[in-house]
């Protein structure tokens, strides 16, 4: 079957549909599943789509993970999800004045950062996530201290 030329929005919608119905652990698997639907795409493009869609990797047991759409049901739900993610994937939190650096397991920074952004806290100016590191900018040094305490509490449960 020849690959279809589809736009970015359609491709990302297909990715979301696949993630909802299949257990996809890797970008390579997602490329293959898209190809089965006639959508030819590179792994680099899938990687960008995953980041733009802010897909999260969730544990499915025995050290395995799968991609999932982030679900939100309000602030308390976000706090519960943050606690689970911090306990499962955050390895360290450090602070310098009003900037905090959160180190996560590989591939989990964007999922944690997304929830921090959705938390809509006045004391958080914004976040920037890489593959395994998140920079959180607090509004003030005092806010940075408070956030450091909260993040450490989230890690401990």
Swiss-Prot record:
Species this protein is from: Deinococcus radiodurans (strain ATCC 13939 / DSM 20539 / JCM 16871 / CCUG 27074 / LMG 4051 / NBRC 15346 / NCIMB 9279 / VKM B-1422 / R1)
Similarity field: Belongs to the ArgR family.
Entry's Gene Ontology cellular component terms: cytoplasm; transcription regulator complex
GO molecular function annotations of the record: arginine binding; cis-regulatory region sequence-specific DNA binding; DNA-binding transcription factor activity
Annotated Pfam families: Arg_repressor, Arg_repressor_C
Keyword Zinc: no
Keyword Acyltransferase: no
Location, primary (coarse class): cytoplasm
Encoding gene, per UniProt annotation: argR
Entries under NCBIfam families matching the protein: argR_whole
Function: Regulates arginine biosynthesis genes.
Keywords: Amino-acid biosynthesis, Arginine biosynthesis, Cytoplasm, DNA-binding, Repressor, Transcription, Transcription regulation
Pathway: Amino-acid biosynthesis; L-arginine biosynthesis [regulation]
Subcellular location(s) of the protein: Cytoplasm
InterPro entries reported for this sequence: Arg_repress (IPR001669), Arg_repress_C (IPR020899), Arg_repress_C_sf (IPR036251), Arg_repress_DNA-bd (IPR020900), WH-like_DNA-bd_sf (IPR036388), WH_DNA-bd_sf (IPR036390)
GO biological process terms, semicolon-separated: L-arginine biosynthetic process; protein complex oligomerization; regulation of arginine biosynthetic process; regulation of arginine metabolic process
Domain of life of the source: Bacteria
Protein name stated in the entry: Arginine repressor
């Amino acid at each position: 079957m020849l690959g279809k030329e589809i736009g970015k929005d359609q491709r990302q919608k297909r990715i979301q549909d696949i993630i909802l119905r299949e257990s996809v652990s890797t970008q390579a698997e997602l490329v293959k599943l898209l190809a089965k639907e006639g959508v030819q795409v590179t792994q680099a493009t899938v990687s960008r789509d995953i980041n733009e869609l802010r897909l999260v990797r969730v544990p499915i047991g025995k050290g395995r993970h799968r991609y999932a759409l982030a679900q939100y049901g309000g602030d308390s739900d976000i706090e519960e999800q943050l606690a689970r993610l911090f306990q499962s994937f955050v390895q360290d939190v450090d602070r310098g004045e009003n900037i905090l650096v959160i180190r996560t397991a590989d591939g989990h920074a964007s999922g944690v950062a997304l929830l921090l952004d959705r938390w809509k806290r006045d004391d958080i100016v914004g976040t920037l996530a890489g593959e395994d590191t998140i920079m959180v900018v607090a509004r003030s040094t005092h806010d940075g201290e408070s956030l450091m305490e909260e993040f450490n509490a989230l890690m401990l449960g």
